[in-house]
A protein has these predicted regions:
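Active-site acidic/histidine proton-transfer and metal-coordination neighborhood
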Residues: 61-83, 87, 91-205
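Short, flexible/disordered intra-domain loops and linkers
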Residues: 10-20, 53-62, 146-148
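Catalytic domains of carbohydrate-active enzymes, especially glycoside hydrolases
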Residues: 1, 16-49
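A short alpha/beta connector and helix-capping loop motif
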Residues: 214-228
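Aromatic- and glycine-enriched glycan-recognition loops and surfaces
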Residues: 19-29, 58-69
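Short, catalytically relevant binding-site loops at active-site mouths
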Residues: 180-181, 212-215
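Short, small-residue-biased leader/transition segments that mark boundaries at the very start
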Residues: 2-9
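Short, well-structured secondary-structure segments
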Residues: 39-56, 81-85
Length: 228
């Protein structure tokens, strides 16, 4: 959550529209407006980068629930439950690999970040008296074809094993795959095949993000297969 860090090539989003939210208060006003126009009850999923850092340089391996107590209180006032996401992209240590990085220092940085995010999710779940769903998606991959597909996936598996070993009663972990990230089109470490196998073996929820499917994919194929 380094303030002002540039968005890396792994994640692209729009946001330069006139009247865009300039701070968290305005973002909450936008959410309240949207919520007022929709029927039903919704949950709000926050990425770690949306914490309230008060202008302090709190790095992602230092984040705590203190940066999200404002969100928790606001969500309670809105009768809205919170879910959570770790954030591996748009950081000087993001590069092309995070949890699957062969460099122990970088890998441990992201392992610690993800562990802290799970603890934040647990605190959210306890506060709202309803489990917080904590999603883990990492951008890890390669622009060029690699001959070490198995190696990177083994590293990712070991990182996830360490992260998920901590039992937290007020949150539920889930893992998200993606066909590829922009700038990493040749190889994705956390592919659908990898996560389907990992989640089935370890009894972990599998996230199907219907907004992130590519022209070569159809989410109904994944849903119909995973429901068996």
């Amino acid at each position: 959550s380094l303030v002002g860090s540039e968005m890396c090539i792994r994640d692209r989003s729009t946001g330069n529209y006139p009247g865009k939210a300039r701070n968290i208060d305005e973002l909450r006003q936008d959410i309240e407006k949207v919520n007022s126009l929709l029927a039903g009850t919704f949950r709000l999923n926050l990425h770690e980068i949306y914490g309230e850092f008060g202008g302090k340089q709190i790095d992602r391996n230092e984040v705590t629930v203190d940066q999200f107590t404002g969100w928790m209180q606001w969500a309670k006032e809105q009768n809205m439950k919170l879910d959570f996401n770790s954030t591996s992209f748009s950081h000087p240590k993001s590069g092309s690999l995070s949890l699957s990085n062969p460099d122990p220092a970088i890998r441990e940085f992201w392992i610690e970040h993800t562990k802290r995010c799970r603890r934040i999710a647990d605190a959210m779940g306890k506060f709202q008296n309803d489990p917080c769903i904590m999603n883990i998606w990492v951008h890890d991959g390669s622009k060029d074809i690699t001959v070490e597909k198995g190696r990177y996936r083994e590293i990712l598996k070991n990182s996830l094993d360490e992260i998920l070993a901590e039992e937290l009663p007020n949150m539920k972990s889930c893992l998200e795959a993606k066909l590829f990230g922009i700038g990493l089109e040749a190889y994705t470490v956390g592919s659908h095949d990898f996560y389907a196998g990992y989640c089935a073996k370890n009894n972990v929820m599998y996230t199907l993000d219907t907004g992130h499917y590519e022209p070569t994919e159809n989410v109904s194929d994944a849903v119909s297969a995973l429901l068996l």
